[in-house]
Amino acid sequence: VFNEKLQISGLDEVDLDYLDQDRQKNSLTLKKSKKKYFLTGSSFNADNFIEDLLSNDDKGSKIIDINSNLEIDIEKIFLDSEYYLTDFKGDISIKNNEIQKANLIGSFSKNKKLKLTINKDNNNKITTLYVDEAKPIVKRYKFIKGFDEGSLDFYSSKKSKKSVSQIKIYDFKLKELPILTKILTLASLQGIADILSGEGIRFTEFEMNFKNEGDLMTIEEIYAIGPAISILMEGYVEKNKLISLKGTLVPATTINNFIGSLPMLGEILVGKKTGEGVFGVSFKIKGPPKNLKTSVNPVKTLTPRFITRTLEKIKKN
């Protein structure tokens, strides 16, 4: 059943029923019928598969040594220890031990969906992931805590060992984000910091555009906008070694005044009098993941890039 690379190979039928290292039950049957394979079962833990997908690691797609179409119908798919999908179905086309095409869909509760597509043309692989329930994806980023609600769109184009990706998250709330809390505190925006540590700060949209090559992630732009604050930043991350980010944070009241609107949160954020409080702040975050250093400086004007991105989002909404 297994070849020298420990891949499942040359089989007509195999039954799998075991507890994995996460203590999740996996119960599957892989069966060949004519030139097609069928993967059915009651449960499967896809935690590692999701991790590989987000990091653009192909190792998870090379478990089965077949060149065929694979039809999937699994009752329950575990995304982690808390979240799971039901009625997970779809088709995967495999060639040279790599996924060439995939179209998969599953359901959360309350009619929420997860949809995954993969299309490989020549040497370019396009991956899209849409999730009505963003939390099981976002919680994988350990520095974000207290994330709630929201839907997520993920797009990635990979050629050779380089990938260009985009993540968008809509209508979500953050309750804990240590780095952001520190920036707000250093910037004397205690009103917003208190909201963040209490009921949480709501964002209408988050967009991150980035590239991956080896252990280096280059963040071309992160932009987030919400009723309380807007943030624009860029930088890079060396996996398990170094994080380097710089950006601008501006209270919503500043943006509203700039475009001639009434302040949304009023004096709690920037004070009672005109000119009181901070117009905005620039910040830098740098260091090893467990020892990040943060610096903050006030800014008197907004960059054209920040203004353009903000107006784009306001017009869109």
Q: What does each model-found stretch correspond to?
A:
Residues 1-217, 222, 229-317:
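Membrane-proximal interfacial segments on either side of biological membranes
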